Structures are given as structure tokens and as C-alpha cells.
UniProtKB/Swiss-Prot annotation:
Pfam families: COX14. The chain crosses the membrane at residues 10-32. PANTHER family: CYTOCHROME C OXIDASE ASSEMBLY PROTEIN COX14. One of its GO terms (cellular component) is mitochondrial membrane. It is a single-pass membrane protein. Plays a role in the assembly or stability of the cytochrome c oxidase complex (COX). This is Cytochrome c oxidase assembly protein COX14 homolog. InterPro entries: COX14. It comes from Danio rerio. Keywords: Membrane, Mitochondrion, Transmembrane, Transmembrane helix. It is found in: Mitochondrion membrane.
């Protein structure tokens, strides 16, 4: 028969493992979001730069 201590140990390990996986997944989501933010920021800067260049050409 399985003792209560052994059941508690297994439960603790399962809980700890799931928390570890959630932490890793949360870190992954954070990195992906930061990467998308930086990519979007770069696209907006390039669009603004090309718009400024186009308006300078029109003025000439």
C-alpha cells in the first residue's frame, strides 16, 4: 500500500513541474511579444522614413 507521504511527494513534484512549465511558457510568450513589438516598431520607422523621403521628392 502506498503511504500518505509518498502520495504527497508525488503530488508536490507534479505541482512543481507544472509550475516550472508555466514559467517557461510565460517567458516564451514574453520574448515573442517583445520580438513582435520591436519588429513592428522597425516597420513603422521605415514607413515614416519612406514617407518623409517621398514628400521631399514631391516638394522638389
Amino acid at each position: 500500500m502506498v503511504s500518505g507521504k509518498r502520495i504527497a511527494d508525488v503530488g508536490y513534484r507534479l505541482f512543481s513541474g507544472s509550475m516550472m512549465l508555466l514559467t517557461v511558457y510565460g517567458g516564451y510568450l514574453c520574448v515573442v511579444r517583445a520580438q513582435r513589438y520591436m519588429q513592428r516598431k522597425k516597420q513603422l520607422e521605415l514607413a515614416a522614413q519612406s514617407e518623409n523621403t517621398a514628400s521631399e521628392i514631391i516638394k522638389e
